[in-house]
C-alpha cells in the first residue's frame, strides 16, 4: 500500500465535500421559523425531509441513519484499503456483536438495536455469534467472539459481553493500525483509545467508584499507562496529558478545556465532545495533504459530525430547545477551524 493509491480517491472526495452544509446554511436552520422553512432549506441536500417528517423524531432518525449507512457503503467501495474506513465503522461492528450475543444469551428480541454499518453484514456477524466460527471475518475476530462467549458462560452476566467486546474493539483498532501501516493515522487511533480511558475514569469518579473499577473499565491498548491517566485525573492534572497531543493548534476551545481540566470541572460528557473536537481539528489541519488516507477520514469524521449536529438541531426543535441551547451543544462544522 502506498500513499499514491489514494490520489484519485481524494480527488473524488474533494468534489463530494461541496455537499456539506455551510455555516450560512446552519445559521438558516437554527433561525428557521417553522418546519416548512426547515424542509425547504434541506431540499437538494442528502437530508431532504417533509414538514411532517420534521415533526417526528423517529422519522428524522431514519433519514439521518439512512444517509450515514449510504456514506459508509460508498466509502467502503471507494477506498483502496477498507481498513481505513474500519477505523470508524468498527464501533458499529462491535455494537452489533454485543447486541447479537445478548440475543443469544437472553433469548430476547433486540434486533431493533442493530445498526447495519460495517465491513461485515449483520448476517455474517449473526452466523459468527451463533456458531462461533466464520470463514468471512478476521480470524482474530472469531477468537474474540469465542473468548467473550466463554466469559459469559462462566459468569452468566451480560456485563461480561460488554466488557469483553470493549476490549476486543480496541485490540481491533491496533490491528487496523498495523494493517494500514501509515504513521499519519496513529494520532487518530491514540485519540480514540486514550480518550476512551480518560472518559472511563471520569465516569467512574462521577459514580464514586474506586480504582479497581477504573482499571477494569480501561483498556491497556492506550498510548499512556492506565495508572498515569488515573493519577492525572484525580490530581486535576489531566491537562498534562492533553497538552502532549501536539498535533493541533490550541485555539479557544482547547484552551477552555485545559482550564476546566486544571480546575477539575471537566465532565465525562464534555470529554466526549472534546474528543470529537480534537479529531475534527487534527484532520482539518491536514486538509492540504493530497496523498494518503487522511482526506477520506476527514470526510468520514465530518459526515458523522454533521449528522450528530443535525440530530441535535432537528430533534431539538421538536422538543422545544432554544437556539442558544442548540448552538452551545453543537460540534464543529465541516471545513472550519475551532
Language-model regions, residue ranges each:
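N-terminal domain-start signal
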Residues: 1-338
Amino acid at each position: 500500500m502506498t500513499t499514491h493509491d489514494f490520489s484519485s480517491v481524494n480527488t473524488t472526495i474533494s468534489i463530494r465535500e461541496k455537499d456539506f452544509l455551510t455555516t450560512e446554511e446552519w445559521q438558516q436552520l437554527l433561525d428557521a421559523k417553522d418546519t416548512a422553512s426547515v424542509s425547504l432549506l434541506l431540499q437538494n441536500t442528502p437530508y431532504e425531509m417533509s414538514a411532517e417528517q420534521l415533526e417526528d423524531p423517529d422519522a428524522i432518525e431514519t433519514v439521518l441513519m439512512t444517509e450515514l449507512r449510504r456514506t459508509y457503503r460508498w466509502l467502503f467501495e471507494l477506498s483502496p484499503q477498507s481498513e481505513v474506513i474500519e477505523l470508524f465503522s468498527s464501533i458499529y461492528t462491535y455494537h452489533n456483536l454485543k447486541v447479537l450475543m445478548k440475543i443469544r444469551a437472553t433469548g430476547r428480541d433486540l434486533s431493533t438495536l442493530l445498526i447495519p454499518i460495517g465491513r461485515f453484514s449483520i448476517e455474517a456477524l449473526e452466523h459468527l455469534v451463533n456458531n462461533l466460527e466464520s470463514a468471512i471475518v478476521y480470524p482474530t475476530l472469531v477468537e474474540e467472539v469465542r473468548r467473550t462467549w466463554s466469559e459469559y458462560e462462566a459468569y452468566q452476566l451480560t456485563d461480561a459481553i460488554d466488557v469483553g467486546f470493549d476490549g476486543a474493539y480496541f485490540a481491533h483498532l491496533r490491528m487496523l493500525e498495523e494493517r494500514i501501516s501509515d504513521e499519519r493515522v496513529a494520532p487518530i487511533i491514540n485519540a480514540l483509545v486514550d480518550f476512551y480511558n480518560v472518559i472511563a475514569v471520569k465516569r467512574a469518579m462521577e459514580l464514586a467508584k474506586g480504582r479497581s473499577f477504573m482499571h477494569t473499565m480501561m483498556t491497556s491498548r492506550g498510548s499512556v499507562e492506565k495508572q498515569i491517566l488515573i493519577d492525572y485525573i484525580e490530581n486535576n492534572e489531566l491537562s498534562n496529558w492533553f497538552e502532549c497531543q501536539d498535533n493541533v493548534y490550541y485555539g479557544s476551545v482547547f484552551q477552555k478545556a485545559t482550564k476546566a481540566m486544571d480546575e477539575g470541572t471537566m465532565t465525562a460528557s464534555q470529554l466526549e465532545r472534546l474528543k470529537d473536537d480534537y479529531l475534527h481539528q487534527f484532520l482539518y489541519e491536514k486538509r492540504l495533504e493530497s496523498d494518503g488516507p487522511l482526506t477520506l477520514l476527514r470526510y468520514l469524521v465530518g459526515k458523522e459530525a454533521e449528522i450528530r449536529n443535525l440530530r441535535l438541531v432537528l430533534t431539538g426543535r421538536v422538543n422545544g430547545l432554544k437556539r442558544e441551547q442548540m448552538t452551545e451543544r453543537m460540534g464543529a462544522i465541516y471545513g472550519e477551524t475551532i
